[in-house]
């Protein structure tokens, strides 16, 4: 039996912290109980040249030359926060190098990505199949970084970024800030 605790609003969506039979906490989306969502994350060859870029375009694509996709991982969760399925793919660095400093962070060497990876368009196609037609919510930590990485690779490979227009992107970093770092909320809890 689940015991409900602590209803919170994160990015305008109501969530409740619940516990499963083993007393492990998980989030329940109380507004959209039929929703399942996907958390995704890229590992990259580095960071963008300019950190303040809010959206990638053809005009500023060169800002992302130092931030190329090396791997893409994702996990599908139910509305009750239960893991349903995972997706992991290495991406071949066909026209860039994976630096040693990047390898130190994520453990993916240039050689490994070349030998075990696949071209980005193939990985993207499989990722879209993994998402499926019913899921519309994608979640990431600092999601603007992952979204820019995704869109920059799509632009480089001639894939229309408009196919992402129907998705809602949620940022766990922003959710955390809203819940725990807001001075107004901190003041109200004192």
Segments and roles (model prediction):
Residues 1-23, 28, 116:
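Extended, intrinsically disordered, low-complexity regulatory regions
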Residues 11, 15-17, 28-30, 34-36, ...:
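Metal-dependent phosphoesterase core characteristic of DEDDh/y 3'-5' exonuclease domains
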């Amino acid at each position: 039996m689940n015991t409900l605790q602590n209803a919170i609003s994160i990015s305008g969506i109501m969530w409740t912290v619940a516990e499963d039979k083993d007393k492990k906490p998980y989030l329940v989306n109380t507004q959209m109980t039929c929703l399942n969502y996907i958390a995704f994350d890229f590992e990259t060859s580095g960071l963008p040249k300019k950190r303040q870029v809010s959206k990638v375009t053809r005009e500023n694509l060169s800002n992302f030359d130092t931030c190329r996709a090396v791997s893409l991982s994702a996990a599908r969760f139910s509305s009750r926060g239960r893991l349903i399925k995972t997706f992991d793919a290495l991406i071949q660095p066909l026209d860039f190098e994976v630096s040693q400093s990047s390898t130190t962070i994520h453990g993916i060497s240039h050689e490994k990505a070349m030998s075990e990876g696949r071209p980005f368009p193939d990985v993207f196609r499989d990722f879209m199949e993994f998402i499926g037609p019913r899921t519309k919510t994608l979640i990431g930590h600092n999601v603007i970084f992952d979204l820019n990485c995704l869109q920059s690779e799509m632009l480089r490979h001639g894939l229309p970024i408009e196919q992402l227009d129907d998705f809602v992107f949620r940022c766990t970093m922003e959710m955390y800030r809203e819940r725990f770092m807001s001075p107004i909320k901190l003041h109200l809890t004192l």
